[in-house]
């Protein structure tokens, strides 16, 4: 495939040993003039790293050797250069895993909304990758869990979804969520009870929280891809 072909060329040009860990980077080109990752090769080189980059089929592909450095190092190096959707995946055993890593990096980048400027590792987007692989499962989860919420008037729906996101970010803590939302804790607790009644899922129960997490991820993916309504 394309990823393996590019990785092989990078191996020949860079002289990378077969089993050296690699980071495979994919930055989506939104149009012919976009630059989702600005001068990545220069940035990596200035920081003492080795990389190879090229544009193929609507994306900027990169291979970065991770010999003597780690994922956090690469994130710090590339983040200031990010100007679009960028996905990164680790090929832990070198070139042999590069093709799969490129696929994961591309899919991770594609889970971000168009126009977002962000770098994500595939390993940090596993729920999104699973749901994006099977949109029909995501649609089923969203309908089953959030269906009654989505049927509410726009303002009420938006308020409850914002509250749900805040509660999920804060581990179900109404106090912390209230601080983020600039409202009273009792208001958040009232909305939380509404969410339980509408969804049948309780944030305080492991399975309920899992279903709510998956449902909101599925909803956001559908909106980002144009399949759903915010």
Regions found by a protein language model. Give the residues of each.
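Cytosolic nucleotide-utilizing catalytic cores of signal-transduction proteins
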Residues: 1-230
């Amino acid at each position: 495939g394309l990823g393996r072909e590019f990785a092989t060329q990078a191996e020949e040009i860079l002289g990378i040993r077969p089993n050296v860990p690699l980071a495979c980077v994919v930055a989506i080109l939104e149009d012919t003039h976009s630059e989702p990752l600005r001068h990545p090769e220069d940035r990596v080189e200035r920081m003492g790293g080795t990389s190879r980059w090229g544009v193929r089929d609507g994306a900027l592909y990169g291979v970065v050797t991770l010999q003597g450095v780690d994922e956090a190092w690469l994130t710090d190096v590339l983040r200031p250069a990010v100007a679009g959707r960028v996905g990164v995946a680790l090929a832990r055993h070198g070139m042999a895993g590069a093709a799969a890593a490129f696929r994961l990096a591309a899919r991770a980048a594609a889970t971000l909304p168009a126009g977002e400027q962000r770098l994500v590792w595939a390993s940090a987007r596993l729920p999104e990758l699973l749901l994006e692989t099977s949109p029909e499962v995501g649609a089923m989860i969203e309908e089953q869990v959030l269906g009654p919420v989505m049927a509410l008037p726009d303002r009420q729906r938006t308020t409850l979804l914002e509250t749900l996101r805040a509660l999920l970010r804060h581990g179900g803590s109404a106090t912390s969520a209230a601080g983020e939302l600039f409202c009273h804790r009792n208001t958040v607790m009232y909305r939380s009870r509404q969410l339980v009644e509408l969804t049948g899922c309780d944030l305080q129960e492991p399975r309920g929280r899992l279903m709510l997490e998956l449902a909101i991820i599925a909803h956001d993916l559908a909106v980002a891809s144009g399949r759903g309504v915010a």
